[in-house]
Amino acid sequence: MKGLLTSLITVLTFTGLQAQSLPTAPKLVVGLTIDQLRTDYLEAFSSLYGERGFKRLWKEGRVFHNAEYTFSGVDRASAMAAIYSGSTPSVNGIISNRWMDVATLRPVNSTDDAAFMGYYTDQTCAPTKLLTSTIADELKIATQGKGIVYAIAPFCDAAIFAAGHAGNGAFWINPTTGKWSGTTYYGEFPWWASQYNDRQAIDSRISSVTWEPVFPRGMYTFLPDWRDVVFKYKFDDDRNNKFRRFITSPFVNDEVNALAEEAIGKGSVGMDDITDLLALTYYAGNYAHKSVQECAMEIQDT
């Protein structure tokens, strides 16, 4: 499972906060995590990148060529917890997305907590099973609680573990309704997120969304053993899990960006001299959980 999540988190900026004088501290630290972006994909598609994205990170950033998780059975929940806490499951408690509770002999979800209600969702989520401090928590301590921390992701576990225990909010897309969701654990749902749900959420636009190849067929040669079939997907069928399929398409990354812009423009993120954290998770996995051979063209576009 090496390379399940490729982390591009810029944590080195944060670790030097206490050693710097306040005026030199960054106003905003942005954490970028890309779910299922494998290292071989990152290299295979390199000729398609623009100069201000991955190429800039490769040239100007710190690249760790042999990084890997030091535990087995890596999935999204355990990987996110490891990335943001800097610890392994034996320490942070998040061994998987789901596991068997030894006390009840029932399966439990890594983010389940019935003590907290959901906003725009019936999920009851909180980071209470995460046993260690996170980057977000340490930022809150360093700024005496004044730094703003928001985490935005397609999935609940990715948002919750990135926001940590002390974050101001964690937001993920409800796979049933398409609305951005949250939990009462972090307090009130921000007005700007509610406004986005009411006016611009994907549920009001999804019937007009169509996904077709970005490039001519001849440019889809980067993955071996791919099926040469041009695809076309629409998301207007309520009977076919349209929001769940949408979340595994590249369009979900546009939604993450859109809510991030709302957080910056209306949520006061990065607006003062106190360092804030905006943790964003994107999706680069297989569409509708198909095999690589079935959706190689889709993976390249994503």
Explain the meaning of each model-derived region.
Residues 1-24:
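Bacterial Sec-dependent N-terminal signal peptides
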Residues 3, 7, 40, 60, ...:
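Generic, well-ordered alpha-helical scaffold segments in large soluble proteins
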Residues 26-38, 57, 83, 139, ...:
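Beta-strand elements within well-structured catalytic alpha/beta cores of enzymes
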Residues 33, 37-41, 50-54, 76-80, ...:
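Stable alpha-helical elements in mature extracytoplasmic
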Residues 38-44, 69, 121-127, 243-250, ...:
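Second-shell loop/turn segments in exported
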Residues 42-91, 148-152:
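Short, structured active-site-proximal loop/turn typified by the sulfatase FGly-forming signature C/S-X-P-X-R
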Residues 45-49, 164-176, 292-300:
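Short secondary-structure boundary/capping segments
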Residues 87-88, 93-274, 283-288:
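His/Asp/Glu-rich, glycine-adjacent segments
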